């Protein structure tokens, strides 16, 4: 089974078979959106190897979607990095990475720790933020634009394949990206004047 809810209502994503392209390797939500904010907590496991998380957005069950993959610092392949993909239907050959939008994560993302991930979408513009769950402020990972706006609307989803095992909790989907609470710290200090 791809996923199951734990007693504490966390979603456990665990796939022990499959090639990553079958119907059981994808999970799709039901609420469609255009502009959006997605915020969720995630916890990567080591079972038996460090895993990654794969989130789909503006997705459809016909396999049209954008995809975010976050690899941990102790994972296989590209380490401590966010990668963006797109897919345009059943043809697996259309599942390609936006290599120019790869971004190193501003904090070390490790297995066996909780993180909060936020994806914002306004038209064809996207932003990614991350923080350790216990931290007050998110850090911006990157911003990018799809000039073709391949997928103007869809649902949230997940993708998994062999050896992926992680938990998701506190999933929130907002109609407006500005509703997501990021508490991002400014890189510039502002002067304040107090009046009597």
List the model feature ranges, each with a label:
Residues 38-40, 112-130:
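Short tryptophan-centered beta-strand motifs in secreted/extracellular beta-sheet-rich domains
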Residues 24-31, 102-109, 157-158:
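Beta-strand-rich interaction surfaces with strong enrichment in secreted/lumenal proteins
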Residues 147-195:
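Ligand-recognition surfaces built from glycine- and aromatic
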Residues 1-22:
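Extracellular glycan-recognition surfaces and repeat-rich motifs
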């Amino acid at each position: 089974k791809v996923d199951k809810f734990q007693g504490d209502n966390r979603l456990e994503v665990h796939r022990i078979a499959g090639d990553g392209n079958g119907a059981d390797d994808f999970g799709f939500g039901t609420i469609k959106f255009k502009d959006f904010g997605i915020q969720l907590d995630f916890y990567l496991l080591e079972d038996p190897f460090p895993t990654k998380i794969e989130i789909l957005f503006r997705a459809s069950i016909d396999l049209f979607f954008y995809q975010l993959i976050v690899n941990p610092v102790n994972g296989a392949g590209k380490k401590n990095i966010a990668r963006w993909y797109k897919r345009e239907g059943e043809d697996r050959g259309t599942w390609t990475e936006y290599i120019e939008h790869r971004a190193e994560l501003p904090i070390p993302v490790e297995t066996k720790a909780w993180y909060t991930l936020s994806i914002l979408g306004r038209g064809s513009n996207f932003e990614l933020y991350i923080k350790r769950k216990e931290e007050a402020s998110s850090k911006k990972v990157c911003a990018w634009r799809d000039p073709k706006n391949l997928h103007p609307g869809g649902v949230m989803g997940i993708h998994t394949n062999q050896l992926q095992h992680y938990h998701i909790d506190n999933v929130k989907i907002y109609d407006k990206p500005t509703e997501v609470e990021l508490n991002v710290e400014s890189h510039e200090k502002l002067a304040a004047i107090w009046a009597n």
